[in-house]
UniProtKB/Swiss-Prot annotation:
Belongs to the thymidine/pyrimidine-nucleoside phosphorylase family. Type 2 subfamily. It comes from Rhodopseudomonas palustris (strain BisB5). GO terms for biological process: pyrimidine nucleobase metabolic process; pyrimidine nucleoside metabolic process. HAMAP family: Thymid_phosp_2. PANTHER family: THYMIDINE PHOSPHORYLASE (PTHR10515:SF0). Keywords: Glycosyltransferase, Transferase. It catalyses: thymidine + phosphate = 2-deoxy-alpha-D-ribose 1-phosphate + thymine. This is Putative thymidine phosphorylase. GO terms for cellular component: cytosol. Gene3D superfamilies: 1.20.970.50, Nucleoside phosphorylase/phosphoribosyltransferase catalytic domain, Pyrimidine nucleoside phosphorylase-like, C-terminal domain. It comes from the Bacteria.
Amino acid sequence: MNASHLSRPPLTIRRISLDTGRENVAVISRRSRALRADVFRGFSRVALRINTKVLLATLMITDDDAMIGPDELGLSEPAFRRFNEPVGSAVSVSPAQPPASLDAVRAKIQGHTLTPAEITAVIDDVAHFRYSDMEIAAFLISAARFTSTDELLALVDAMASVGTRLKWQNPIVVDKHCIGGIPGNRTTMIVVPIVAAQGLMIPKTSSRAITSPAGTADTMEVLARVDLDVEQMKRVVTTCGGCLIWGGHVNLSPADDILISVERPLSLDTPEQMVASIMSKKLAAGSTRLLIDFPVGPSAKIASASEAMRLRKLFEFVGDHFGIAVEVVTTDGRQPIGRGIGPVLEARDVMAVLGNEPNAPADLREKSLRLAAHLLEYDPLLRGGAGYARAKELLDSGAALKKMQQIIDAQGPSVCNSELGSHAADVLAPADGVVNGIDCLRINRLARTAGAPIVKGAGIDLFKKIGDRVDQGEPIYRIYASDRSELDLAIAAAEAESGFSVNHHSPAAVEPVS
């Protein structure tokens, strides 16, 4: 870098209380002597340097001296945390050189197949925030056109290697994953304590919701801490045989979260990208046995058996290459599983099943038992075919509930507000008849409109499922919100399209709950 391009004089770091998501943002005053119009422009990429430490950031220019003085450089919260230098430190600023790995992205755009070294370079730069969202999008779109099996294997390996790689002494480390898309469906929080109660190791890391009303981490956070670091996670697993934590805090496949944040707005979800995302995290987690749940249904991610078969073979191919035994089960994805949709409501359902309460959702209980049965079959001390009976025994006896409480105590108490939303409205059946369809995507959107998952107590409580008979005006589900304006938005959305079909009628009336 030409020395004349460095900021002269150096600027001093100032921390700005500005959440810019995953983006590193640096703010400079328009009156700064370091600002050169021919070099620095708003939204350009810059390199911040202190000795040998370098951070890439997006530059923004302000006219507000109260925000940033002429001799200061403001760092957004993410940038300040990643740079990890104290306020007042002298920092130089220069235009950022484009990452060399962009040559590989250009080659991929032109239809070339990338080498493992090229893919590793791209993923390393993505994980270290050297790519803009536009550059990430270019890579993802070019890969969506065609990804060879060799490229897929290299992508999984690179994504797993760039972050934390967990290693366990146990020869059998079981794991479970659902590809998502079904409201509720909080089986993981029931399967983990059942499997751990059997004595199998199941260190479960889960994601937060991106487009759904709750992820497993969001729901578990109602009951316990989920933001454990690697050493804390290992202590919990050593004590309990399992855990239920947020994967983002232990840095498993960090590039995946960055790629997903760009994929979702573009509606990019190819089989190869899905497999790379899931398998990189399982490889990084040290899993040796993996059960994957494929819900199949008209509004699920997989709509047909043929789609499920192709995706299953892709998962098995990658698993075989990396020494992970992959088992795929297809399940009913026509409707939500359980009654609650949203963190607090889903946590209620989970604890009702674990506590063997008479009003516990039967579908959530049964699906959890069947999934747990598959994992228990990996226990060499259990007779073949005895998995389901043993899972049921562990649940019915209270052993699974006891194990869940041990995990909760080991992870630490929740600091979240676990109260149900104080504002509610019932969505009413549009006609007499039978519920003959539920749009999972629509129900998810309605629960998010009500405030979930950011507001833990927001969401939807289902009263009816497919096949249930209803009378006109009878409540079919209740919307909860913590803010009246969010409830009003959800009511308007439900009146336009409730997500329920009764005798092929979907418009519904909505009645506030006093």
